[in-house]
Amino acid sequence: LKALPLHHELWYEIDDIQDLDIAESIFAEDTITPIASRYGGYWRYPHILDYCYLVNPYFPNSRLLAEIKANFERLISQYPSGVRVNSLLAGKNFNIKPEYVVVGNGAAELIKSIMENMEGKIGITLPTFEEYPNRRDKTTVVSFIPSNPDFSYTAQDLKTHFADKDISALLLINPDNPSGNFIGFNEVLDLCEWTQKKGIRFILDESFVDFTDESVHNTLLRNDILEKYNHLIILKSISKSYGVPGLRLGILATSDPLVIGRTKQDIAIWNINSFAEFYMQIYGKYETDYQKACLRFIEERDYLKKQLEAIPWLRVIPS
């Protein structure tokens, strides 16, 4: 066994194929591409600071994590519940009827189901969260690109652009990802009304709505709205603002029984693991803490915005 003295050289011990895979990404000339192409698992790189995934650093708190840790052995050794129970838990947490909601293995699983089963063409604002257009044939995507440097747009802009387009569905991510554009409650409701009259399915992604000021007043995730607008499908990731991307949780909500039934057929009976289910089971005890965490996040965002605006050579895009 030989040993070599090292001073400032970068090194990595390789004992198996996994070590080799990690080393190849560390020592590559272009380190960003091989690491980014992993789409996660960045605990393997303890010195990396990940600014790509928009996750709330203030939630879950230590008490919630302690409760999960205390139940670790029981959770890892038992099967989770099936689809019906998970819909019940999600309905309780979001105060909507269980029959209106499907829980997915992250919002990505639900996006895949909706996008691949949607007939006709779909209107999408660009730039966007790529999981949506990536699940469609490019010929079925009708795009709208805002003609301003901030990538900002209103509900009226969407209505004007798509009024004469042959689309069967319209996607709105609100707040948008990655632009941060936000459309207020009344405007979104007006867009929902417009799509209903036009016979267009309205897909609304509210994954980031809890990061908005007065977020409780900005969501359409309500029984009365879902029941009035049968064409409305709401998607929400339980990763971003909830700070638990590793649990892989997301919900789809609609009063359309055909969409609910088709989505449930697409997912596996045990698509959610025991830890994710337990999180939904105990979340209600920590809801006040979650709301405080979101307020703290908003304060930090406002502070960051002011600090960036003080730099003369930066143009800060409203978000």
Where are these regions (language model features)?
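Short loop-beta-helix segment that forms the pyridoxal 5′-phosphate
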Residues: P80, G91-S113
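Active-site pre-lysine segment of PLP-dependent enzymes
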Residues: S152-K165, P178-S241
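Hydrophobic beta-strand scaffold residues
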Residues: V141-V142, F202, V316
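PLP-dependent aminotransferase-like
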Residues: E109, E116-L172
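Short, conserved phosphate/pyrophosphate- and ester-handling motifs at nucleotide-, phospho-/glycolipid
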Residues: D16
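Catalytic donor-sugar/metal-binding loop of nucleotide-sugar-dependent glycosyltransferases
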Residues: L1-L6
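PLP-dependent aminotransferase class I/II
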Residues: H231-V316
